[in-house]
From Swiss-Prot:
SUPFAM superfamilies: Acid phosphatase/Vanadium-dependent haloperoxidase. Catalyzes the halogenation of organic substrates in the presence of hydrogen peroxide. Vanadate binds at K341, R349, S416, G417, H418, R480, H486. This is Vanadium-dependent bromoperoxidase. Its EC number is 1.11.1.18. It catalyses: RH + Br(-) + H2O2 = RBr + 2 H2O. Keywords: Disulfide bond, Metal-binding, Oxidoreductase, Peroxidase, Pyrrolidone carboxylic acid, Vanadium.
Amino acid sequence: QTCSTSDDADDPTPPNERDDEAFASRVAAAKRELEGTGTVCQINNGETDLAAKFHKSLPHDDLGQVDADAFAALEDCILNGDLSICEDVPVGNSEGDPVGRLVNPTAAFAIDISGPAFSATTIPPVPTLPSPELAAQLAEVYWMALARDVPFMQYGTDDITVTAAANLAGMEGFPNLDAVSIGSDGTVDPLSQLFRATFVGVETGPFISQLLVNSFTIDSITVEPKQETFAPDVNYMVDFDEWLNIQNGGPPAGPELLDDELRFVRNARDLARVTFTDNINTEAYRGALILLGLDAFNRAGVNGPFIDIDRQAGFVNFGISHYFRLIGAAELAQRSSWYQKWQVHRFARPEALGGTLHLTIKGELNADFDLSLLENAELLKRVAAINAAQNPNNEVTYLLPQAIQEGSPTHPSYPSGHATQNGAFATVLKALIGLDRGGDCYPDPVYPDDDGLKLIDFRGSCLTFEGEINKLAVNVAFGRQMLGIHYRFDGIQGLLLGETITVRTLHQELMTFAEESTFEFRLFTGEVIKLFQDGTFTIDGFKCPGLVYTGVENCVS
């Protein structure tokens, strides 16, 4: 049926013509992505040692070495993306309901119809097993585990964190890590730099973001963000038999022990708890609700093209409905992280490398770790002591202490899905706030006391909205490290991947609006990006070549 302009809709364009326009716009967006991306090479680190490959839940021998035939079956699953083939991958422990279910190895075979294709973005290879950089990454995760119960505000004086800062700074590979906070003199300040990142605002003020400790209101219900956190001084998988059972996909011994007091997030164990119990995007929704309550989006419905006009307000575009839809849409970045995890890198989790390190130190394996880790006496003696204190008969192990019984999820480590998601969410929030408002000071900042029972006013330097959004993203990414299940490169590269994907998704959407508008905000690394409706974009005022954003490094004046 063909409709004329006399159709009942008050629309100067007949419905069939509008359908054609929508189709043409979608095709043009897809062509722009295809032509703007070009050929993207996906490169892993070339590692052939199975010790550095993901194989959790597969059968292992008594030394935790994966069965070669089972590993080949996993490779076949990944290559084919077929549910029936993946169902035939052997499991090491098949008692009862399989705990070690592989987490969505077929996800990357889906096709997205918005934003870039999964394979149209990439991340750098991870360091190889013998490298000083991997040694430093693993050492940082160990130090995070040792410091789980130190209040963040005591990082500058507590023995563990002061020692951790000095020890990490002295490792050859540490200054080369992604977004690592380190002084020009090569030292790490334990209070402002330890376990932080160089992203805008993350090194300023309290460790924990305001968006994780401020109350939020949803549907007129105000929620104080105290949680039932993990019990202090309790770690898991420090006994070798327990570790091996989990590597085989066996069931944990029981649930985690919990604290009997509700607390604000005041230390690494609390932050680990948040990132273990979250529903992957809830921190972003909480953050958005807090920012709305603070009029950080100027005020609800008055943003973007509606800021300087009086008779109209946004809702579906540049209003509450739009804000929360964009946060939900940013979840699509997760699929790109799954592509990188399964199809490209398949890197082992920290708990697996911790087992290999333990067996190497014990002389039962001969893994080629860098000496900066193998001979790190200060770190290893502390790991031995904390593990022996919890093990039967005070058995000394060098396994990585986990905050949870089950250890890592059953999918590869690199990049972190939580980080990719939160890189996307942070990008959406900063785009909606805008550059000017993003640089304003966050009002009445606070931090939890050392017991996590009350909030104390922070009297230091200005904490900006954009900085606290960035800090939220880094907190969530590094909270997964504090669980013991990720490395720094998982978090940082995941955040940057989520940012890149979301910039492109926002730009696609911007070009469809009837309202004249732009998005202008600061990227994690400090550059100001501005997106225009004609498809162009600038970095720090320089008009970038190309059709789509592929990273700051590809747009230099």
